[in-house]
Amino acid sequence: MSDLFAKLMDQIEMPLDMRRSSAFSSADIIEVKVHSVSRLWEFHFAFAAVLPIATYRELHDRLIRTFEAADIKVTFDIQAAQVDYSDDLLQAYYQEAFEHAPCNSASFKSSFSKLKVTYEDDKLIIAAPGFVNNDHFRNSHLPNLVKQFEAFGFGTLTIDMVSDQEMTEHLTKDFVSSRQALVKKAVQDNLEAQKSLEAMMPPVEEATPAPKFDYKERAAKRQAGFEKATITPMIEIETEENRIVFEGMVFDVERKTTRTGRHIINFKMTDYTSSFALQKWAKDDEELRKFDMIAKGAWLRVQGNIETNPFTKSLTMNVQQVKEIVHHDRKDLMPEGQKRVELHAHTNMSTMDALPTVESLIDTAAKWGHKAVAITDHANVQSFPHGYHRARKAGIKAIFGLEANIVEDKVPISYDPVDMDLHEATYVVFDVETTGLSAMNNDLIQIAASKMFKGNIVEQFDEFIDPGHPLSAFTTELTGITDKHLQDAKPLVTVLKAFQDFCKDSILVAHNASFDVGFMNANYERHDLPKITQPVIDTLEFARNLYPEYKRHGLGPLTKRFQVSLDHHHMANYDAEATGRLLFIFLRDAREKHGIKNLLQLNTDLVAEDSYKKARIKHATIYVQNQVGLKNMFKLVSLSNIKYFEGVPRIPRTVLDAHREGLLLGTACSDGEVFDAVLTKGIDAAVDLAKYYDFIEIMPPAIYQPLVVRELIKDQAGIEQVIRDLIEVGKRANKPVLATGNVHYLEPEEEIYREIIVRSLGQGAMINRTIGRGEGAQPAPLPKAHFRTTNEMLDEFAFLGKDLAYQVVVENTQDFADRIEEVEVVKGDLYTPYIDKAEETVAELTYQKAFEIYGNPLPDIIDLRIEKELTSILGNGFAVIYLASQMLVNRSNERGYLVGSRGSVGSSFVATMIGITEVNPMPPHYVCPSCQHSEFITDGSVGSGYDLPNKPCPKCGTPYQKDGQDIPFETFLGFDGDKVPDIDLNFSGDDQPSAHLDVRDIFGDEYAFRAGTVGTVAEKTAYGFVKGYERDYGKFYRDAEVDRLAAGAAGVKRTTGQHPGGIVVIPNYMDVYDFTPVQYPADDVTASWQTTHFNFHDIDENVLKLDILGHDDPTMIRKLQDLSGIDPITIPADDPGVMALFSGTEILGVTPEQIGTPTGMLGIPEFGTNFVRGMVNETHPTTFAELLQLSGLSHGTDVWLGNAQDLIKEGIATLKTVIGCRDDIMVYLMHAGLEPKMAFTIMERVRKGLWLKISEEERNGYIDAMRENNVPDWYIESCGKIKYMFPKAHAAAYVLMALRVAYFKVHHPIMYYCAYFSIRAKAFELKTMSGGLDAVKARMEDITIKRKNNEATNVENDLFTTLEIVNEMLERGFKFGKLDLYKSDAIEFQIKGDTLIPPFIALEGLGENVAKQIVKARQEGEFLSKMELRKRGGASSTLVEKMDEMGILGNMPEDNQLSLFDDFF
């Protein structure tokens, strides 16, 4: 009995008498398979013989009971050295088989369990009645019985059935007589029951209820069966089945309510073998609450029937029973203080390579009790801000690092060069063929060389070498060398010595010489021969520097380009001769083009400054040790992305050296130079390289396993030897050796997600390596790169011995973590740029404008508001933000553009006064433009100053101006006025680039950066990756599994970008590296702006961010101003004609039937969408305040639908009184009598959708206060439904712009349509648009039908919107002209009387550049032919043909050639 087996017997308390029996004498545990997710342990035992049945049953029962107590399921099977086929033992085990699944099925057990068995002719024979000896039982059940006997220890046993005629007759006779007796008894029982019933039947009114069926007892029995039921792996279900039990994790839940009030819970579960869709019905709310455990992330046991869902056509479980189960996550079982620190972990910011968020990585480390964890994403630090915040919250040290791409600044062409005339030198051009890429683990099989002088081959060397083992198929395929070539080969040492003699007094030459020289030196060293010391020329680097314009510099492409023969590439003799021919071509060109004659000149005069771009990348891990190191890290990341980017961010070694203070370096993974040296050059070379680093990394053997498949390492023993060699390198170099995990995902079962992400990159991607060549290439396996606990890591390194494993896994990693100081990644304060006298300027501009409008002295209400705002703005250092925004708006205004405000900036009266926003947040009021007399309405009776009736100033008679939207300042900077202002501005799209450049001009190029963004894999994209993986790798997933895999693969960084309008301004007394690295968006080194490396949201509370967005409204207003000469500022906000648009179409001179809508909203910003048009139709707004309500209602979430809409329909509230914008809540509650602070807090809770999420005590406090102040219940209930609310200032700015546009639609229609089609229309179909009303209406009808059938394309949907406006324009009596070759503009619509002439870009397929070219060409002269239009105008044949079909070209001939008869007429 083995020690392990004995220990198990102690644990299950197996009786001593059974343990001492002969059957247990050599008992052993062959293998234990542990399935952590399903909590199933599979034991495989070895015994000397098949166990006595009593012993087997005892072993089975004790195993099950012991492990069941720990919530673990157990199965086991036995391998017996000797098998006893006695009838008694076989009969006992035969009956035992029916106690085990799947042989315990009711139909099989009832028919077979009592039958007799015998052993005859090496078969187990079952004597059975004839009616069960059929194909169904043979095919369905006998294979299960064979498997069960194999598990008992009988080996593979042949089982057969024979029909027993005597048994068949006896059973048939018994069945017939029993059936007759049963029928007779049933008839008799029925008659007696009926008589008894008639005799006992009571009067109707005293009817006695039937005996109650004990449902509770039945349910208890059913539940007990559910608890003990066999769990079916999801992957095994392929057809409809009943009473199936699953266990797994819920990853998606959706609850729906039917029209009848029933509820359905659609959810998806996975057990990580596959995934399944499930549904559970609940008849009412009470029953629904019983299934609250069905939630995302919950682990459940469910039972139900598998059926095909008629809607999804997928197998779906209709759940009958459900129970939440305990899921045991992996734990780090080492004692406190003896746990490792993970120092090499990637997050989802490692581009298309890793999965965990930095938060989940840190949470896992903290949960396991680790004192620290490192972040080492590939070449970026975008996880730092979130990691910094999460680590502080979790109470764990975050070690901030990255895995960098290190390159040499200049890659030499020549190694060990000497002063030598290249023309007079003798060269030995050589090549080696090997069994792999590792000089330490693979073998030389051929050395070939050509000795050359002045371009001529003077001697050749060619020797095969027997490696002592058969060649792999891959080696033979690659090199063409077979075992036959090696039969008579000389010993390796003999060949090495001969080659050294051959190479004397010459320059060595090889293509990719570092490989060949490294391989030779490793073999020289192994055989105590001197290593290469003479000069070496690498023709690969020679070609890269001599011909930088070539994309490929491999031997094959170069020989083709220079027409050098290479018949058998990858055989050393052919490769060497071809390389020699190329060498002398290179030498000639170097001499003629660059004047290079001496060997020393190759490195000094020819190696390019940017040769780092072609240098081989080596990975290194870099860690921030202190605050100085953090800034140096930011500088390195910036330089690698801005100055040294080539395919990936690169860090030249000298650049790293210059910024190494405060940083620590590790040797990284198998792509690091120290690991590579151990593999290819030997320990001595690795020791020299290791001196550059602060520690040596080793990783679990499983991480290096793909190197075995790629034939870089022979086997597991080879991996372990490499790890030992790395430890030896650390010992010799006096560097600590640390075990790291190279984490790319957290849990082992998440491996498939990374597999899908990596394979989506396609062959050729750096991390998606392949094995083999050409069509036969297969993807190399990815390593098992989950986050390992200390125990798991110690197990991985157990081959090192307990003490050494503990040292590298625990002690050294903890010591390293202790060297890391706490650093501040994200600043705690706001750092705004400095503008001289910003505070004085803001105050001066404010009062200057206020005095101009309201007079001096100011009205108290104005004076107090300004004082309140300036106290906050100036006191918190926000003046520079205001002033910067004012300068930008002012510059755009000077260029002739209005600037619209977004967000809550219009809540600030100071912002209004200094010109940042047009929105005036004061209460509605009158003010006289002549004498500055003013009147304020402060009781809330008027929603907007624009709605006040017109009246003259009572003092001077001048017509009053009206303004004021009643918006509290608190909604912008918070109740205490200390919230960082977020000033968003809508510039004209045409002027946006100029506004961006204004920021640079104001603050300086080195302080202004575009706000960076990070683009991750969206779930829809991930879905495509999963389907592609299915297709490419022959996988077949059910829909639920596809959904799970897509969700798992989503969220990984894919690219970077920039905010469309956000610009970050760094204070001019600091530099950008105090806050963030910088880079180019999407790695586009030609971009005109650099961006913040961090997502701008990560630092938006530390630096000034200006939102300079492009918008159509200011562009539209500028276009209308240019067309009309009307200053948009002078357009009244209460124009009766404009307001009439919201109640009908009469003002347009058309009927609703003509334009297909009951109001004039088509094409009006904010109000022209189908959704808002519907709201207008329901509410009929008549005031500016009501339009603000509509804007708020349409932009909010759960503010209109199911809320305000119902209140208005039921007559409970009106458009004026419902909650529309967030600010209205505070203003309304203050007018009702609540304290401002409470009114503000309620507004904040409601607008963020937190009303139902706060504590019941807090919410009830607010409700009581509102009811005490007579706030109606419907208002309170409405608050509880809201998820998000729109700021009133934003609504006011948008509505004001919309009304200005609407003004032109009413009063200057042709100009409006011209501006609309030039700026807002997204799709055109000129043939239809120029074809008249009938053509337009017919096309609209066509698209409408397609929409109903969900067949309309996006372009057709956009076209429908355009055609609605065309139809309206035509119905109003205007005309849509045809494209005119000589009158149409390139990009703008033209007005000719009552007709619009479309521009060239309106023609489908004709872009802006061609449009401008046509206009330019026609100015040079008339187009005499279609050929000339194509040639001078740049139009394609397709475009010319389309123009001709539309009648634009008239009778234009095909070409300019004159007819032979033209001269006669």
Curated annotation (Swiss-Prot):
* Record's catalysed reaction(s): DNA(n) + a 2'-deoxyribonucleoside 5'-triphosphate = DNA(n+1) + diphosphate
Q: Which GO terms describe its biological process?
A: DNA-templated DNA replication
Sorted alphabetically, the keyword list is: Cytoplasm, DNA replication, DNA-directed DNA polymerase, Exonuclease, Hydrolase, Nuclease, Nucleotidyltransferase, Transferase
> Where is it localised?
Cytoplasm
Q: Does the keyword Chaperone apply?
A: no
Any matching Pfam family: DNA_pol3_finger
Principal cellular location given in the protein's record? cytoplasm
Tell me the disulfide pairings in this chain.
none
Q: Where is the Exonuclease domain?
A: 427-583
User: Looking at the keywords, is Cytoplasm present?
Assistant: yes
Tell me which CDD domains the record gives: DEDDh, PHP_PolIIIA_POLC, polC_OBF
Which GO MF terms does the UniProt record name? Answer: 3'-5' exonuclease activity; DNA binding; DNA-directed DNA polymerase activity
Protein family per UniProt: Belongs to the DNA polymerase type-C family. PolC subfamily.
Q: What is this protein called?
A: DNA polymerase III PolC-type
